[in-house]
Amino acid sequence: GGLAVNNLLRLIGRRLVALPIMVVGVSFLVFFIMSLSPIDPAYSALGETATPEALEEYRVQHGLNDPFLVQYGRYLWNMLHGDLGTYGVGTSNHVTDLVAKALPITLQLTFLGLLFAVLISFPLGVLAALYRDRWPDQVIRIFSVIGIGTPSFWLAALLVLGFVGKLPVSGPLPAFTVDPGGWFLRMLLPAIALAVPVIGQMTRVVRTSMVEELDRDYVRTAIGAGIPKRIVVARNVLRNALITPVTVLGLRIGYLM
């Protein structure tokens, strides 16, 4: 319990410390690759009818003639101040506005997918461990492998084809506080598509952790002393075995987003 929470908090802390370095590294790599493109941004923005003077004016206005490091430094400075640039050639649509618009729905979808993953994978993993090498374990392991190998985008397309006309697959998302039923129905299919691969992985992680804990000496000693196995599992094994799955689950939050 408390140990699992502490491990998760330490993991989150390490990730937060590493996040700025990762952002700078990834942004530098992407910026460098984009700079190697033979396509002239000014030509793409202004089109074929643009005069050489107009193209040059566009390059000067947007700093495209500056050295690469100067351009990247300007981009990084703007990014640190919340300006991520624009999207769409020749438009003034800000990426920051796009992210701000999509982030609330992304967080809601992540939460629901995470909830599905926890409610399904943890009981399945525990059940598989308790029936190790018997048919429930074998069936659960087969389905977990299938889940791990199922691409979310492919499953999402299948769900849309299978449930079109039965569940809403398009249209605006109502606010949860206004229409919780409508919100859940519109979130259901994408949340399932996101959760299935995580369910497959987490089921295996929970099973492995439970099996390792069930094989420990204190479990055999307690059962040998006459304590019912279900009591040992409920009071000790579950608490100790869930430390690793909770940590791994924290890592999967980024995948769900």
Predicted ranges, named:
Residues 2-5, 65-122:
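An internal, D/E-rich "acidic patch" concept
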Residues 13-23:
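N-terminal signal-anchor/signal peptide hydrophobic helix marking the start
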Residues 22-73, 163-186:
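Hydrophobic alpha-helical transmembrane segments of membrane transport/permease proteins
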Residues 29-36, 66, 74-77, 142-171, ...:
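Membrane-water interface segments at the C-terminal ends of transmembrane alpha-helices
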Residues 35, 48, 126-130, 161, ...:
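Transmembrane helix-loop junction
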Residues 37-39, 89, 128-133, 163-168, ...:
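Short helix-capping/hinge motifs at transmembrane helix termini and TM-loop junctions
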